[in-house]
Amino acid sequence: MGRVQLFEIRLSQGRVVYGPGEPLAGTVHLRLGAPLPFRAIRVTCMGSCGVSTKANDGAWVVEESYFNSSLSLADKGSLPAGEHNFPFQFLLPATAPTSFEGPFGKIVHQVRASIDTPRFSKDHKCSLVFYILSPLNLNSIPDIEQPNVASTTKKFSYKLVKTGNVVLTASTDLRGYVVGQVLRLQADIENQSGKDTSPVVASLLQKVSYKAKRWIYDVRTIAEVEGTGVKAWRRAQWQEQILVPALPQSALPGCSLIHIDYYLQVSMKAPEATVTLPLFVGNIAVNQTPLSPCPGRESSPGTLSLVVPSAPPQEEAEAVASGPHFSDPVSLSTKSHSQQQPLSAPLGSVSVTTTEPWVQVGSPARHSLHPPLCISIGATVPYFAEGSAGPVPTTSALILPPEYSSWGYPYEAPPSYEQSCGAAGTDLGLIPGS
């Protein structure tokens, strides 16, 4: 064996995740089989972000640095054979962004150590990646506790000469959620035509924007639930739930090259109608509950009033008059409730969460003290990229699992609205899989 038998960095107490402004301490451990002359032993703590225009390409076209500090552990001299430990400590900046890894870029924080040897001798280097979690407090976002509502009216033709309208209104109970929290969705559909609509679909979308020479967008569907269609001349109401899986936080504050957005999209294919609700995913849950509706004020999503046009267009007056009158809204059933569809080759990777026990479903877990960390969106098919890039597994051990449909809690789909209503007088809870 050579002179240097072991050269590695060890962080105190085996820590892997740190917060901005925290001290990072550790030792550089060295085992020598023979005396080693050296000119300097240094350790560097650094954080940076790199973005590429091609998927899974480490040749960054744009980079930015967040911190870069070096310490000299030993000056010129010679180390005898045996074990040697050199302690170090750095103070992480308060503005350091959360670690992240995606197909077009990553935010990496690491410690590097080097032994500078005399001329014509081999230098020695080692490094260790650590992770920073800068918790996003959802309560700092204005109106985060308010219901989220959007509506659209779609006019369409059918049977060559007939026309009709469909009014689609979607709402959620909050505007922001944490991992493991249930997103409550309500969709109200009024079919002002003699033709049945296609099924209504709700999708939780993630959009990651990378700033390279131009903006690159990577969009993926995180979870999806499908309801039935609405019969002709009918009003219908659809209530469902989506469990928020392990996801990186919104925005990534402190980083100007990568931005993360989340949306809930409710849509129908026939007629083509779509509403999109922006959402936030954070680490510290909203500490307020939605307000109950007050008399004379607009109702909450649980009792959202339907949007009805004042009168149909003139050319539809005869059809509306001859058609049946609208009855009370009917409740739509759910055809399928699937968290993200599995990729063709499942990745054997895991997401990092705390050991904090989950509390009742539908209320935030106690993430204020130990919020979960998810640094990666996993392997995805790029929405916009050069070439025909496909899903490629990353090498990171902290990566979002690509499979949600068959995993146990918290990746198991929550119960349907009808199932949850059956447990009257009890808190909302997951039904264990059989």
UniProtKB/Swiss-Prot annotation:
Source species: Mus musculus (Mouse)
Motif (PPxY motif 1): 401-404
Region (Disordered): 292-349
GO function terms (MF aspect): arrestin family protein binding; identical protein binding; ubiquitin protein ligase binding; ubiquitin-like ligase-substrate adaptor activity
The family this protein is said to belong to: Belongs to the arrestin family.
Keywords: Cell membrane, Membrane, Ubl conjugation
UniProt remark on domains: The PPxY motifs mediate interaction with WW domain-containing ubiquitin-protein ligases.
GO cellular component, one term: extracellular vesicle
Described function: Functions as an adapter recruiting ubiquitin-protein ligases to their specific substrates. Through an ubiquitination-dependent mechanism plays for instance a role in the incorporation of SLC11A2 into extracellular vesicles. More generally, plays a role in the extracellular transport of proteins between cells through the release in the extracellular space of microvesicles. By participating to the ITCH-mediated ubiquitination and subsequent degradation of NOTCH1, negatively regulates the NOTCH signaling pathway.
Protein localization: Cell membrane
InterPro entries the UniProt entry points to: Arrestin-like_C (IPR014752), Arrestin-like_N (IPR011021), Arrestin_C-like (IPR011022), Arrestin_domain-protein (IPR050357), Ig_E-set (IPR014756)
Gene of this entry: Arrdc1
Sequence motif PPxY motif 2, residues: 414-417
SMART domains: Arrestin_C
Superkingdom in the source lineage: Eukaryota
Protein name: Arrestin domain-containing protein 1
Bias-annotated ranges (Polar residues): 330-343
Post-translational modifications reported in the UniProt record: Ubiquitinated. Ubiquitination by WWP2; promotes localization to extracellular microvesicles. Ubiquitinated by WWP1.
GO biological process: extracellular transport; extracellular vesicle biogenesis; negative regulation of Notch signaling pathway; protein transport; protein ubiquitination; ubiquitin-dependent protein catabolic process
Pfam families the record matches: Arrestin_C, Arrestin_N
Quaternary organization: Interacts (via PPxY motifs) with ITCH (via WW domains); the interaction is direct and participates in the recruitment of the ubiquitin-protein ligase ITCH to the NOTCH1 receptor. Interacts with ARRB1 and ARRB2; the interaction is direct. Interacts with TSG101; may recruit TSG101 to the plasma membrane. Interacts (via PPxY motifs) with WWP2 (via WW domains); ubiquitinates ARRDC1. Interacts with SLC11A2; controls the incorporation of SLC11A2 into extracellular vesicles through an ubiquitination-dependent mechanism. Interacts with WWP1 (via WW domains). Interacts with NEDD4 (via WW domains).
Transmembrane as UniProt keyword: no
